[in-house]
């Protein structure tokens, strides 16, 4: 039996207020009721109300020291009220020095995706999130696109056969890595019991917006781009430590903060760092495996996390900077940022400027969503998505409508909001994309 839609009534009201019959049909074929176009707006209103309610719960937590109250928040781009409120709620707990919302930001679990918070001697477990160490890697090959243009569809299908996509998958091939021999790292993080499972999942990609892209740069050279994180290891670590810290799982919940010098804090930091190393190892393995399929050698590579906590110095202070869906961009530091499926990606570099300092040397991790996953499935069809990709010469293997490029902002528009903080070194145009297929559900993929 289908559950009632809590946003339907408000969506119908918004539709009527716009002078449209809620039951009129819109879209191709049989279409859908017009009120469905207003459901996302109704959902955001609901989330904003929940964020207001969460403020009361946050006020009942341990009082925030006066010197950490009203910490500055730098906002890039435009965001809905629910996202801003969620960020303010996060910054009302713990030793917060400053915060940032990047231009691709949107609501996330406990903290906005695209949200950056600097803490003094503390870390937010919920801020780092469930996919610890999620990030991007891109590698340039000494192979030209013109040399593989004709075989590109076959290459990406071979990639989809060799690399495991989806939830809970194991690697088709046995992968050995020195990380699994580092007994101290597994013991200090209290994750020893999960070592064997993690061994089997290293090099698997997952679902949702996680991908393997083949792209070409301005000079015509081929790049491999990948996006995924620490798989089941990171999710298990986050779940265990979130529970141990008394935190909650959800959108509008107080952040789970731990002191760096507490026993729980030390173990969580060890677990986070282990998951970060695991993420790096997995992405490096996938890139090299795809390189073997294409041929050639790597001539340049860029690699970064965007779900992690870093020990950094800002304004002369030693801080923990928690980035959830945000790319580190210190002066001279390079990063790989993907667009939506089929859109251009970029290799960028941080610059030194007052705006960059205010951003905590952080930038976007992608184009950012316009519509939630369920909303995207209601609004767009597979035919529309395939046509959009075909017009751009992109071969797609897998993916579902929730990753439709129409559900995302355009990356150049998002990056424009960060002007003066980063510069683009390369623009990468995709020609083949591999992702998990339809029906894969992963609530923590972002």
Model-found features: residue ranges?
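Short secondary-structure transition/capping motifs
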Residues: 31-35, 144, 148, 403
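Amphipathic alpha-helical surface "interface" segments used
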Residues: 30-36, 177-183, 434-440
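Core catalytic machinery and nucleic-acid-binding channels of phosphodiester-processing enzymes
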Residues: 105-108, 133-140, 225
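Domain-length cofactor-binding catalytic modules of enzymes
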Residues: 57-86, 94-100, 107-113, 117, ...
């Amino acid at each position: 039996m289908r559950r009632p839609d809590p946003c339907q009534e408000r969506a119908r009201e918004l539709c009527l207020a716009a002078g449209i019959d809620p039951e009129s049909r819109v879209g191709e074929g049989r279409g859908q009721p017009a009120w469905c176009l207003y459901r996302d707006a109704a959902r955001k209103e609901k989330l904003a109300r929940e964020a207001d309610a969460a403020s009361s719960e946050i006020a009942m937590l341990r009082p925030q020291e006066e010197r950490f109250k009203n910490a500055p928040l730098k906002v890039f781009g435009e965001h809905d009220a629910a996202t801003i409120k969620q960020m303010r709620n996060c910054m009302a707990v713990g030793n917060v020095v400053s915060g940032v919302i990047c231009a691709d930001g949107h609501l996330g679990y406990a903290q906005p995706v695209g949200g950056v918070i600097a803490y003094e001697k503390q870390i937010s477990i919920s801020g780092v999130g469930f996919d610890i160490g999620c990030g991007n890697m891109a590698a340039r090959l000494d192979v030209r696109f013109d040399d593989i243009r004709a075989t590109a569809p076959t290459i990406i299908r071979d990639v989809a056969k060799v690399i495991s996509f989806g939830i809970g998958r194991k690697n088709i091939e046995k992968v050995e890595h020195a990380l699994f021999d580092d007994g101290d790292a597994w013991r200090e993080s209290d994750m020893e019991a999960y070592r064997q499972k993690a061994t089997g999942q290293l090099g698997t990609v997952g679902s949702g917006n996680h991908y393997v892209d083949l792209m070409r740069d301005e000079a015509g050279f081929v790049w491999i781009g990948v996006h995924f994180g620490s798989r089941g290891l990171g999710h298990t670590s986050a779940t265990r430590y979130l529970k141990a810290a008394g935190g909650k799982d959800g959108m509008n919940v107080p952040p789970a903060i731990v002191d760096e010098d507490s026993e729980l804090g030390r173990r969580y930091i060890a677990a986070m760092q282990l998951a970060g190393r695991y993420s790096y190892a997995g992405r490096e393995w996938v890139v090299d495996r795809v390189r073997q399929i294409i041929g050639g050698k790597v001539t340049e590579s860029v690699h970064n996390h965007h779900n992690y906590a870093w020990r950094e110095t800002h304004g002369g202070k030693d801080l923990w900077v928690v980035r959830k869906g945000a790319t580190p961009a210190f002066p001279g530091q390079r990063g790989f940022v993907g667009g939506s499926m089929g859109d251009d990606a970029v290799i960028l570099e941080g610059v030194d400027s007052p705006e960059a300092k205010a951003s905590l040397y952080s930038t976007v991790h992608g184009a950012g969503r316009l519509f939630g996953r369920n909303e995207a499935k209601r609004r767009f069809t597979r035919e529309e998505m395939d046509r959009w990709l075909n017009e751009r010469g992109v071969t797609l293997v897998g993916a579902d409508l929730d990753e439709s490029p129409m559900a995302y902002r355009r990356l150049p528009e998002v990056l424009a909001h960060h002007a003066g903080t980063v510069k683009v070194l390369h623009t990468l145009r995709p020609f083949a994309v591999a992702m998990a297929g339809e029906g894969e559900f992963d609530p923590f993929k972002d």
